[in-house]
């Protein structure tokens, strides 16, 4: 199993190109199922989760051509509506094929998903909403069997809790439903807006983008289009955090500063100089040790839970102390024991972590537990004294494209070992 060997103590400097967002690419790939003519998706990141979903969609009989950063799909060859456990088990996002398959073909059989071990993340919100649209759903032997007679019917749906995947699944189902569907308490993440914009390019009628109420007027069919995946705001924030923790200066390009304001505000509070351009962000820590800053994770546009672990890592070597409150996912402090092994001073009390900054971290063998937590260990290793070995880095490969090449280009001493 691959590991990262990182030698700390290098101030990162340079420029890094940001990839397309994994969290946008996955629903956009699922939405290709809805197109009745060829469709092209550009700026697709080369990641394990993306490859898995492309494989899953190809397994439905759809012709998939994946080359470089471009995926082309032709749904005219579809032969079945079955998403098997072997592919679904590694990734939660595979449940996103449920809505499009059901809406377009009236039938879907999808295994219950796997993916990161963060909290319960139940799919019951997806299923309840699909039933409201007229679907008949049975869950047996670990599979969701969904059918509908004729077309799905528009409905007024209110999610019990904010669910990104649920919003995406129902949005994709509603675009081909008969009549109007109103989705209330919808998630407002930029990746959902990206999905809605591609669906509109395909001929869908959607109002209320960037709000918590989406109104969808169903159409009979959607056509293909050419579309580009939005920049990855979490990858952007992660590389800026690498500059902050090492006292360096990093410019991220091919990104969108407007999607990351809550995080950039925190970097500025830490003492960094942040410069924004139209499609770039530069963070200069000017060799200083960052100031520890408190924050609370909340749904977009507030501070994203997917940046919690990275900002905690920066706080670990910060001046002073900070309280970090995680309100989105339970069980999302799994990186704390690993950071503590490197000398971090962190106390966890329920959904709060109290971080008292230390001047130095020591290298230690550590283990990645989930996607974002694993990047926090990379950040800590970049400033630790000595050589840190990070195990289970397959978690990192699920969400960061060419991570070692990108970090090496900034001066980091990182290599992949087995």
From Swiss-Prot:
Query: Into which family does the record put it?
Result: Belongs to the EPSP synthase family. MurA subfamily.
Q: Which organism is it from?
A: Acinetobacter baylyi (strain ATCC 33305 / BD413 / ADP1)
Q: Which residues form the active site?
A: 116
| Alphabetical UniProt keywords | Cell cycle, Cell division, Cell shape, Cell wall biogenesis/degradation, Cytoplasm, Peptidoglycan synthesis, Pyruvate, Transferase
Q: Which InterPro entries does this chain map to?
A: Ankyrin_rpt, Enolpyruvate_Tfrase_dom, Enolpyruvate_Tfrase_sf, MurA_subfamily, RNA3'P_cycl/enolpyr_Trfase_a/b, UDP_GlcNAc_COvinyl_MurA
Please report the name of this protein according to its UniProt entry. UDP-N-acetylglucosamine 1-carboxyvinyltransferase
In which broad location class does this protein mainly occur, judging by the first location in its UniProt entry?
A: cytoplasm
Q: What is its EC number?
A: 2.5.1.7
User: What phylogenetic lineage does the species belong to?
Assistant: Bacteria, Pseudomonadati, Pseudomonadota, Gammaproteobacteria, Moraxellales
- Offer one example of a GO biological process linked to this entry: cell wall organization
Catalysed reactions, as listed in the record: phosphoenolpyruvate + UDP-N-acetyl-alpha-D-glucosamine = UDP-N-acetyl-3-O-(1-carboxyvinyl)-alpha-D-glucosamine + phosphate
């Amino acid at each position: 199993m691959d590991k990262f060997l990182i030698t700390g103590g290098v101030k990162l400097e340079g420029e890094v190109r940001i990839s397309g967002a994994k969290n946008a690419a996955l629903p956009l790939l699922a939405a290709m199922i809805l197109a009745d003519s060829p469709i092209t998706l550009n700026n697709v990141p080369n990641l394990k989760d993306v490859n898995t979903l492309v494989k899953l969609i190809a397994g439905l009989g759809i012709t998939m051509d994946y080359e470089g950063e471009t995926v082309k799909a032709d749904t005219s060859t579809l032969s079945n509506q079955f998403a098997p456990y072997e592919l679904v088990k590694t990734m939660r996002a595979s449940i996103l094929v449920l809505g499009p398959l059901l809406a377009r073909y009236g039938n879907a059989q999808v295994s219950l998903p796997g993916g990161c071990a963060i909290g319960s993340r139940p799919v019951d919100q997806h299923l309840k909403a699909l039933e409201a649209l007229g679907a008949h759903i049975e869950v047996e032997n670990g599979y969701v069997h969904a059918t509908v007679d004729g077309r799905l019917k528009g409905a007024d749906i209110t999610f019990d809790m904010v669910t990104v995947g649920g919003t995406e699944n129902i949005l994709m189902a509603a675009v081909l439903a008969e009549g109007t569907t109103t989705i209330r308490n919808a998630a407002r993440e930029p990746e959902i807006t990206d999905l809605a914009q591609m669906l509109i390019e395909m001929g869908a009628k959607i109002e209320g983008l960037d709000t918590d109420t989406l109104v969808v007027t169903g159409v009979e069919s959607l056509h293909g289009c050419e579309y580009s995946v939005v920049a990855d705001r979490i990858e952007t924030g992660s590389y800026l955090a690498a500059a902050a923790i090492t006292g360096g200066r990093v410019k991220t390009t091919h990104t969108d500063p407007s999607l990351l304001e809550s995080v950039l505000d925190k970097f500025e509070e830490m003492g960094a100089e942040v410069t924004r351009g139209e499609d770039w962000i530069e963070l200069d820590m000017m060799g200083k040790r960052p100031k520890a800053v408190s924050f609370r994770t909340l749904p977009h546009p507030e501070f994203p839970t997917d940046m919690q672990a990275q900002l905690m890592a920066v706080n670990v070597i910060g001046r002073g102390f900070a309280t970090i409150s995680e309100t989105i996912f339970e069980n999302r402090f799994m990186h704390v024991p690993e950071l503590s092994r490197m000398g971090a001073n962190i106390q966890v009390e329920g959904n709060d972590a109290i971080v008292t900054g230390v001047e130095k971290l020591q290298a230690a063998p550590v283990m990645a537990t989930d996607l974002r937590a694993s990047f926090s260990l990379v950040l800590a290793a970049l400033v630790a004294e000595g050589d840190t070995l990070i195990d289970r880095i397959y978690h990192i490969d699920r969400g960061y494209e060419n991570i070692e090449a990108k970090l090496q280009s900034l001066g980091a001493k990182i290599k992949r070992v087995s």
